From Swiss-Prot:
Keywords annotated in UniProt: mRNA processing, mRNA splicing, Nucleus, Ribonucleoprotein, RNA-binding, Spliceosome
Protein name, per record: Probable U6 snRNA-associated Sm-like protein LSm2
Main location per the UniProt record: nucleus
Record field: compositional bias (Low complexity): 102-117
Region Disordered, residue ranges: 83-117
Gene Ontology MF term list: RNA binding
Source organism: Dictyostelium discoideum
Record PANTHER family: SNRNP CORE PROTEIN FAMILY MEMBER, U6 SNRNA-ASSOCIATED SM-LIKE PROTEIN LSM2
C-alpha cells in the first residue's frame, strides 16, 4: 500500500511510464488504483518514429503488470517521508508475521495425536 499512497499524492503531476515492451509514455497522472494501474492524460510517446500509431492517442490506461519503471520529477519526491513510511510498514509487517507465527505454534501445540497399539 506504500506505493499506492505515494502515487496517489502525485496525481496531476507529469510522469513518464516505461513499459516492458520498451514503450515510454509521458503524461499527467490522472489516477492510480491499488493494483498500480495508471491512467494518464495528455500523453506523448517518447519515440514517435518507432510508434507512429500512438501519435493520435491523448489518454491511456496502463495495466500495472506491464510497467517496468515509473520516472518521477525529483522535486515531487519527498525521500525522507518515503523512507519513514517504508520503515513503519516493514515494522508492522514484521509484527504481523511474528503474531502469525505465534498463532501457528499455539495451534500446533494444542493439537494432540493419539496412536493405538
Amino acid at each position: 500500500m506504500l506505493f499506492f499512497s505515494f502515487y496517489k499524492s502525485l496525481v496531476g503531476k507529469e510522469i513518464t511510464v516505461e513499459l516492458k515492451n520498451d514503450l515510454s509514455i509521458t503524461g499527467l497522472l490522472q489516477s492510480v488504483d491499488q493494483f498500480l494501474n495508471i491512467k494518464l492524460k495528455d500523453i506523448k510517446v517518447n519515440e514517435e518514429d518507432k510508434y507512429p500509431y500512438m501519435i493520435s492517442v491523448k489518454n491511456c490506461f496502463i495495466r500495472g503488470s506491464v510497467v517496468r519503471y515509473v520516472h518521477l520529477p525529483a522535486e515531487d519526491v519527498d525521500v525522507e517521508t518515503l523512507q519513514d513510511h517504508s520503515r513503519l510498514e516493514a515494522r508492522e509487517q514484521k509484527k504481523q508475521n511474528k503474531q502469525h507465527q505465534e498463532q501457528t505454534n499455539q495451534k500446533s501445540s494444542n493439537t494432540t495425536t493419539t496412536t493405538t497399539v
